[in-house]
Amino acid sequence: SQLELGWAVLTPIPPPHQIFRQVGSVLVVHNDAHHLSAIKELWESKGFKIDSLSMKKIDWHQHEDAMSLKEELNSILEGNQLFQGVIWLHPMMIGSKEELDSDGDIWLQHALIFSGAIKNRLDTEGSILYVAQGSGNLGSSENGSLQVAQSLSALAKTVQAEWVATHGRFIDLHKDFESVKFAELVWQELNDPNLSRNQVGWDQNLQRWEYERVLHIPQFTQQELPFSSRVWLVSGGAKGVTSACLLALAKQSPDTFILLGRTALAEEPAWASEVYDKDLKEAFLKEITNKGEKATPKLINQMIKQVQASREINRTIQKLKELRATPIYVQANISDQSGLGGTIKPIIEQHGEITGLIHGAGVLADRKLEQKSIKDFDLVYGTKINGLRNLWKVLDSSKLSHVLLFSSGAGFFGNPGQSDYAIANEAINQIAWDLHKNHPHVKVVSYNWGPWDGGMVDENLKKLFQQRGVQVIPRGEGAKIFAETALSNNQLPSPVLVVGNDIRGKDLPISPKNWEESITLKLVDNTLFTEHSIGGVPVLPAAYALALLLRSSEDHYQGYKVQKFQNFKVLQGLRFDEQISNCFTIKSSFVSESNETIQISVALQSSEKKKSLPKQHYHVEVVLAASAPQPTGQIVAHPWEPSLFEAYENGTLFHENYFKVLSTSSNVKNGISSFDVNLPEVPIEKIKNWVGNQFAPLLLDAGLQAMLVKGRELTKLPSLPLSIDSGSFLAPLRSSKY
């Protein structure tokens, strides 16, 4: 299948619907008690039992790993109590642009080992929420400072990937929210039925956000002209994946590349001369035996790796020279800030200011969350983040044109066994957003790579990935994407590029079940409907009711998308008048399932206190299919103004302003009419419960409007849509004109 290529784009989403959770116990972990009383009051009013734990009560310094902390938690918490939820209230930090928020590192470390330590206290189907206070825009705010706390989103995703039945979610709440509102928003997120959503933000305007992976078919056509005055500083660039990317870059732009690596480029030992890699072990053992010495397995591996690393570095250097580039290899430890500056300074004096940074260094220390240690975190996170911070300090940012960072799909998606690696790579993404905002003259790209073919992915692992539905990046294609993205003149949708699909693989089979959720619909939150009035009363358009039911259906079935719907009926239209209660229920009943699809029946209903039976408003049958996302491209928007189509003036259509989307019809053969449609971009504050809805309700409404026009033409009578027999979804929208 075609390699998925997508950009992380901040997208508005509606407030969460609410499911009815079983009452239980919740543990709130806090560094200060500022919001604690409001949380306790709200939760206890719902019947929950709240326990609290101050982070200050934990002696963090005595713990080397999650297992050690687990023992202290067991001594602090009562008996063998299980919690249905854990809420980690992350300490609020003030980000530092100079230090790239190094102050926040220790609390990420604490959150990591706490998560592993609390596992045995969390109900298998419970939730763990990580709540931070920032801009509410998940780190992409123009005004917010960098906070690495945002990378807790990767921890939340990894929790869910490892503890399959447990839900993990990161919540970024605007720092100015009062405690009552703070508690209310956390409550809403705890009760959100959409368990595939692991990362949300609420800004100061109470708009909710998430990162959407907007897929694109790669089209990098306009290339910058190569010029040899570029000087690139590259970490991890002489070996592996980074080396492949560098060679692709040098092929288009033969520049100067300063390659930083830990390996010392010594002359190859005599015993390894002209020996193939596969025969090195045998040659080394022969050398040791001839000397009458003994070799440990550790020494053997060390010597072989050293020879192989030197060979790979020399191959990279030779290939760069063949491409007319100027490679300079420097042995350096990017974790050593003091030594790094002294190493780089003379190179800058000789070759000129560094104009591009490529940060590809990284290490792994895979193990389960409950086995994670401080040492693991410091090694994995330190190499990625402290290494980047140290590199940044030796550079003159005003001279930079490019910052290209190697991140991982583990950060964007989460990945079992890689919680620290996921956090580090999501921190890279956050730094990319920060640099993108604060250094607009620099092209910043954070490449969230999936697994690459070759290297750590051997044939057996490749087969495993294929069975799980995980795309493996072909070496040539990945390197080409790197180079073309770096050198193209295309306007990038965001600084975070995701290459490959979800590395967690296919979702587990879902057991069909009936479900019920509540939703609040207020005209004040959806003022668009004042432009859809009958008899002076705003009415919920049938197309929007259908889109609401379809989106709710997808929320409950992770990895499934609506394939089609049938038998949609308007039973009693929803009028926004004084009689409306604002509180509604969306109820689902299971119909059938096959290997690839699930069919359910969904209805929107309201209940008046004086009546025992709920009032039925809309009903539809939905077929969901296990489906991979499709490339969309950005929607091509066209200038818009309300249509002057005569049907809006002569009483055929009652729609106003944003609903005036049809234009002149032209009659064609056999009595068929065609219409032009131009869709506006409706402001998000006018359509809060439908913002970001993928089912194009306004386009569907345009289709229903066209039917009303045709009905008037045939019968000379006005009409309203009361049912739709069926509909299928083939592809996402690509334009605002049809």
Region spans (language model):
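Glycine- and acidic
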Residues: 25, 95-101, 134-141, 168-171, ...
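Acyl-thioester-processing domains in fatty-acid/polyketide/NRPS systems
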Residues: 37, 49, 180-198, 472-738
